[in-house]
Amino acid sequence: MIYQTHYKISKIVDGDSIIVENIFNHKEIEIRLYGIDAPEAKRCSKLIQDERETHIAGEFLIELGLKATEFLRTIAPVGTDCTLIQEKDNTIDVYGRSLAYMILPTGEEINKLMIENGYAKPYEKSYCERLPEYQELNLVARTQRKGLYFYSEIF
């Protein structure tokens, strides 16, 4: 694992992407929250793919994506300090974003909080070390109809 400290959140992009800024050199990088997938908050090619896979209308998926984004803003507001943890073999996704687990000053992991509260699901198209834990947390959130599962059994 690679640990990187001295970052703060500068923008919430959507329910699974955050822009962080290095507090020393002010360089910004986009982080894809590793191992999780939240619905898209705007129309894009991934939304079309999700529509096909879930058989749910894009407009409804966007509503869910906006709810996930808003939840992320509440647990990790702009200006919050954070630590990034990356797996050595998986640091960048196909879009050039850095893959990371993000840790809040409280020690809580943002990725885990998103799944625990039902605002994201495990990203199962590629393996991450925490996937088994995320799958268990997702099952509990889904069973208890937390977060987005209140509105839909799948997303």
Where are these regions (language model features)?
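Small beta-barrel nucleic-acid-binding modules, primarily SNase/OB-fold domains
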Residues: 1-155
